[in-house]
Amino acid sequence: MDPARPLGLSILLLFLTEAALGDAAQEPTGNNAEICLLPLDYGPCRALLLRYYYDRYTQSCRQFLYGGCEGNANNFYTWEACDDACWRIEKVPKVCRLQVSVDDQCEGSTEKYFFNLSSMTCEKFFSGGCHRNRIENRFPDEATCMGFCAPKKIPSFCYSPKDEGLCSANVTRYYFNPRYRTCDAFTYTGCGGNDNNFVSREDCKRACAKALKKKKKMPKLRFASRIRKIRKKQF
């Protein structure tokens, strides 16, 4: 220790450093969207190798037969490897995952918005309205689009890893598991740890899981009646 530095100042600096590291640990890590949202690519060769890719439309890892050369990075040897890489992709309603179709041959194009799964935002495009009865990723304005498609948010501390603490007690507590979206029991030692620590499972659910289960109200659009048929399949 620097003899010229007061003891109190050293303790304060140590406390601030630990607090900053704790805050950083609460933030969710990257979701690998640049890999997981790449389209399925079999490659040009003719081998039949069992692989797994993240399917943006079902929001799950699925099997495919890889040709053996080229392709892209959305290509995993096992389901577990795919799930480990892509589970952080935020879940959105099915209609918000659909590709946008541009009606180049229609007249009277109007400004619409679609949800971009890669950027997780709503973006402007011009639609001719040729397929008004088709279920599409198409909304009349940005607010309607974001209101229905934007991923549900939970407090940042819900992403903090399970932390049993630093002491020697054996206290049953609960933490939110963001991967499986469940509140699980763990043994807390009585001191230290982080804010992802709840006295009861219900407290954990109220803080971290309740917002994820709340259903969003379907906007009143031309294709709303058909979209209702797929609501049961939403995550």
UniProtKB/Swiss-Prot annotation:
Tissue expression as described in the entry: Umbilical vein endothelial cells, liver, placenta, heart, pancreas, and maternal serum at advanced pregnancy.
A GO MF term: serine-type endopeptidase inhibitor activity
SMART domains registered for this protein in UniProt: KU
UniProt site positions, description: Reactive bond: 46-47, 107-108, 168-169
Signal sequence extent: 1-22
Domain spans labelled BPTI/Kunitz inhibitor: 36-86, 96-149, 158-208
Highest taxon listed in the record's lineage: Eukaryota
Cellular component aspect of the GO annotation: extracellular matrix; extracellular space
GO biological process assignments: blood coagulation
Main subcellular location of this protein, as a coarse class: secreted
Keyword Repeat: yes
InterPro entries with a match to the protein in the record: Kunitz_BPTI, Kunitz_BPTI_sf, Prtase_inh_Kunz-CS, TFPI-like, TFPI/VKTCI-like
Location in the cell: Secreted
Cysteines paired by S-S bonds: 36-86, 45-69, 61-82, 96-149, 106-130, 122-145, 158-208, 167-191, 183-204
Keyword Disulfide bond included in the entry's annotation: yes
Keywords, comma-separated and alphabetical: Blood coagulation, Disulfide bond, Glycoprotein, Hemostasis, Protease inhibitor, Repeat, Secreted, Serine protease inhibitor, Signal
Record note on quaternary structure: Finds in a complex with ABCB1, TFPI2 and PPP2R3C; leading to the dephosphorylation of ABCB1.
Domain commentary: This inhibitor contains three inhibitory domains.
Its biological purpose: May play a role in the regulation of plasmin-mediated matrix remodeling. Inhibits trypsin, plasmin, factor VIIa/tissue factor and weakly factor Xa. Has no effect on thrombin.
Protein's recorded name: Tissue factor pathway inhibitor 2
Gene name of this polypeptide: TFPI2
